[in-house]
């Protein structure tokens, strides 16, 4: 599994998230620390989004992610936070595709509003599969 092989860890750490929330003056429920290769969460709902950041890192932060963000983020059926920058857009799209992958109505909404992004993630799944980036014990929760 790519996550463990790359030396990453996943941890539920209320103190870390509380400190980060105070430091940034926002309420944080998940964070990815690339230099420490660690995903921190304080709520399960942040898990897939943070694994999206890991996947973005594994792929080397390709320029294509920035292009997709600029072209389609404004119309994508995602929360406002996902529209702040390419990193957040990619992570939220990843989570959206995992959560709604079997919901034809939700996926059609993504396809209609962000067609290039939808195609990108469909091709990515065919090429590598999401299970390569999310440990099985985490993926099985969703």
Residue ranges of predicted features:
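Active-site-flanking segments in enzyme catalytic domains
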Residues: 1-142
